């Protein structure tokens, strides 16, 4: 990793696919363009996403997860033991290809190495982050038709993910984020769910980040310091920063990734609003352990709005950096 400034800015993972990529995917499904043409479109989209992140001033970018349709489906398609029967309705007219576990979970081959290697080759920084969905969330959002209990399934999946993460490190990944938005869904699962995440990152030599977003933070707060990761990032903006008090109460002692951008609202935060929110966070945590990010992935927004939100996030962060510099902090 290269040296980062005080209050590094990053994204959670996903970013809106360019319209022309969505059209290329449609044409490929219709058999009108080749696999090679689709891969070229994916590669071009990664370059476009990284350009947006660069122009916005993001310190730690991602490839936007543009090759992935969904955060669970992508991995279930590539790990032995899963099967898809068809889409299920999530709400209204929204459908999701929910996977089912029908046999023992086994790691087959690298899933993310090729996409990381390409993103690394075109990235403007070696502080490139790669994301992977965690074992608990994949299981929670799947059907179990094989294992006698959920815990055994999660731990088998954690072992498979551990192999993938180690392959990413071997390919040069320095910052790896495990996405566990479902970890705090069920209070009774949290303690062993944390153990499963630790199994997934066992023996990994990289900067490890975990993402937690919407849900009941009070379920997971007592266990956060047990996670074998360097940083945990949270959705805060949507909760008006109320979880800060909870984390402080439980003595949260890791790096904190603070969500300051509401990804479900098309309103674009101003840079001064972001700066005020960061000042609020600094009442609870020191700047040396604070990173700045959106609440969650940006993929559901338009590309224009997502980009403008990132610009506000970065500009607001710069305002606070300058204030800290005047107080004697080293910010570069």
From Swiss-Prot:
Pathway: Amino-acid biosynthesis; L-methionine biosynthesis via de novo pathway. The keyword Methyltransferase applies. GO terms for molecular function: 5-methyltetrahydropteroyltriglutamate-homocysteine S-methyltransferase activity; zinc ion binding. Signal peptide: none annotated. Its cofactor is Zn(2+). The keyword Thylakoid does not apply. Keywords: Amino-acid biosynthesis, Metal-binding, Methionine biosynthesis, Methyltransferase, Transferase, Zinc. SUPFAM superfamilies: UROD/MetE-like. InterPro entries: Met_Synth_C/arc, MetE_arc, UROD/MetE-like_sf. Zn(2+) binds at residues 211, 213, 296. Binds 1 zinc ion per subunit. Its EC number is 2.1.1.-. One of its GO terms (biological process) is methylation. It comes from the Archaea. Catalyzes the transfer of a methyl group to L-homocysteine resulting in methionine formation. The physiological methyl donor is unknown. PANTHER family: 5-METHYLTETRAHYDROPTEROYLTRIGLUTAMATE--HOMOCYSTEINE METHYLTRANSFERASE. Belongs to the archaeal MetE family. This is Methionine synthase.
